[in-house]
UniProtKB/Swiss-Prot annotation:
Principal location: membrane
Gene3D superfamilies per the UniProt record, alphabetical: Immunoglobulins (2.60.40.10)
Species this protein is from: Mus musculus (Mouse)
SMART domains: IG, IGc2
Stretch list, region Necessary for interaction with ACTN1: 78-149
Protein name: Myotilin
Residues bearing the modification Omega-N-methylarginine: 20
Family recorded in the similarity comment: Belongs to the myotilin/palladin family.
Length: 496
């Protein structure tokens, strides 16, 4: 538990008449003539500003001298007393550490900006012999009042709080937090250079304080504080980034190509370099110019393309791609072969198939002749349905002259309809339609003969008188009847 009582060795025995700080001069009190002097070093960087009350600790008879800051003047009294030449660049923590052996030395506190109002400023350059003339008028120091003792307690508490705050500035990993100046130094000089600068400053600060136990005198080294503008200028000079260059390098290149004449062609590649290289194309040593048929495209991340809208025979040859920048150049070569365009002709009917009408059971042929380069593919449809070839009844024949024959055996009524023939090749398509009608075969019948009636007497007299036939022949009815029947095609009636 913390004890707020004032340490006994911290409170010096006082004169019953009280003590007052006097202007610089020789001591008249009964203290030893030899005065102790303490040394304090002021760091260029201060972390926190603390208030300091000079009346809390000045009662100890210590003579402190400094050449960098003015000393307090004497109080408004006729009797000059003790000689106190104080330097106010000393923090409360440093002052307590000089008195209390157990207290650590703090070097990161600021110079107290104010002192007790009972003191007045005096010139530092005041001669020492002028101070000795006031030694005879020194009065005995009065007793320190209680409010001054209470102020010293508050200073001690503030010193302990400052110690706790310094511990709080450490991070969890044990690294100390960077101040604004350290951050700026790291940004301008880099982390390694900044660390080296601060280590050099810390080593100089640790070596600079010199404490003489015999004289106990304060030596304050005057260090020139570097201004922010000059530090930035030096950092900019040291941290100047030198521009770097990298020669071109092809990461991706196209392979040799063979393209048919009239087709589209594209060559893609990727190149890197710093700064970005300029790309040029050459065909047989002559630069390739961008026009309607040749285009050069540059995309992001170093991708380039050479495009041929329509490949011509004159585009064939070795292409050299050259990439240049300040650091150098790189080259690759690709071969482009252009194949001659084949002569093509769309299919054309020399003669078309004719419509036909056949009887059931007959064999029919649908013939046509087609001319095309290259030879076309043929498709036959019946009523918009594909015709199945290579069956027992239906077959397709064609020759090199372009004659095409669709043969249908044993035609039936199912084979009737509209037939469409299509010829297709790379150059085009042609079609033609024809009609096939199938009818039933008719049945042939003979008409019935007409019957005639003939009298036999007539035939007898005719035979005797007209032709002079034999009596026997004249009276032979069967022979006459057969003759008449053969001439007229008549048959003998059953009624006779």
């Amino acid at each position: 538990m913390f004890n707020y009582e004032r340490p006994k060795h911290f409170i010096q025995p006082q004169n019953p008449c009280g003590s007052r700080l006097q202007p610089p001069g020789p001591e008249v009190s009964g203290f030893p003539s030899q005065t102790k002097q303490s040394s304090i070093v002021i760091q260029p960087r201060q972390c926190t500003e603390q208030r300091f009350s000079a009346s809390s600790t000045v009662s100890s008879h210590i003579t402190v001298s400094s050449s960098a800051y003015p000393a307090p003047q004497q109080l408004a009294g006729p009797n000059p007393g003790q000689k106190v030449t104080a330097t106010y660049n000393q923090s409360p923590a440093s002052f307590l550490s000089s008195i209390l052996p157990s207290q650590p030395d703090y070097c990161n506190s600021k110079i107290p900006s104010t002192v007790d109002s009972n003191y007045q400023q005096s010139s530092v350059n005041q001669p020492v012999n002028a101070m000795s003339s006031q030694a005879a008028n020194a009065r005995p120091t009065p007793k320190t009042p209680d409010h001054e003792i209470q102020g010293s307690k508050e200073a001690l508490i503030q010193d302990l709080e400052r110690k706790l705050k310094c511990k709080d500035t450490l991070l969890h990993n044990g690294n100390q937090r960077l101040t604004y100046e350290e951050k700026m130094a790291r940004r301008l000089l880099g982390p390694q250079n900044a660390a080296a600068v601060f280590q050099a400053q810390n080593s100089d600060v640790q070596d600079s304080p010199q404490h003489n136990p015999e004289q106990a005198r304060l030596h304050v080294p005057t260090s020139q504080v570097r201004s922010r503008s000059s530090s930035r200028a030096e950092a900019n000079d040291q941290d100047a980034i030198q521009e770097k260059f990298y020669p071109p390098r092809f990461i991706q290149v196209p392979e040799n190509m063979s393209i048919e004449e009239g087709r589209f062609c594209r060559m893609d590649f990727k190149v890197s370099g710093l700064p970005a290289p300029d790309v040029s194309w050459y065909l047989n040593g002559r630069p390739v110019q961008s026009d309607e048929l040749h285009k050069m495209i540059v995309s992001e991340k170093g991708f380039h393309s050479l495009i041929f809208e329509v490949v011509r025979a004159s585009d064939a040859g070795p292409y050299a791609c050259v990439a240049r920048n300040r650091a150098g150049e790189a080259t690759f070569t690709v071969q482009l072969d252009v194949l001659a365009k084949e002569h093509k002709r769309a299919p054309m009917f020399i003669f078309k198939p004719q419509s036909k009408k056949v009887f059931e059971g007959e064999t029919v042929k649908l013939e046509c002749q087609i001319s095309a380069i290259p030879p076309p593919k043929l498709f036959w449809k019946r009523n918009n349905e594909m015709v199945q070839f290579n069956t027992d009844r239906i077959s397709l024949y064609h020759d090199n002259a372009g004659r095409v024959t669709l043969l249908i055996k044993d035609v039936n009524k199912k084979d009737a309809g509209w037939y469409t023939v299509s010829a297709v090749n790379e150059a085009g398509v042609t079609t033609c339609n024809t009609r096939l009608d199938v009818t039933a075969r008719p049945i042939q019948t003979l008409p019935a003969p007409k019957q005639l009636r003939v009298r036999p007497t007539f035939s007898k007299y005719l035979a005797l008188n007209g032709r002079g036939l034999d009596v026997k022949q004249a009276f032979n009815p069967e022979g006459e009847f057969q003759r008449l029947a053969a001439q007229s095609g008549l048959y003998e009636s059953e009624e006779l």
